[in-house]
Amino acid sequence: MAKIYYIDSENVGDSWIDLLSEDDSRFLVFYTGHSPRIAYPQAIQLMNATNKPEFVECYEGNNGLDFQLVSYLGYELHTDNTNEMVIVSNDTGFDAVVHFWMDRGMNVKRVPRSNASNTQILEIIEPVSDDEIITSL
């Protein structure tokens, strides 16, 4: 197996689904009741994918999903001969785990994903200068 993806669904939503097209990879989707719901187009894509993910339900708590994900990753590093372990998350807190394992010769990395596919796309509003602020009517 080439890669195992550890997906932080609380953080990236369903933006990982397009990764399912990668052959010879395994997908572990960690989720809680706080994970965003999957939209119908992504659900259809998921159902039609030949590479089916495994879903890992996590206990909720402060950073609960994150701790369970890295525990699972550490366990798999010990028992699996996968070439690459990939954490799919925008949470830079995982970078410490990545550096920890890389210092020990393991091929672990974190890749960010845009979660715009399952949430509203927010407009970025340019900040206004003090001259543009209306202070009285």
Where are the language model's segments positioned?
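Terminal and domain-boundary accessory regions
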Residues: M1-L137
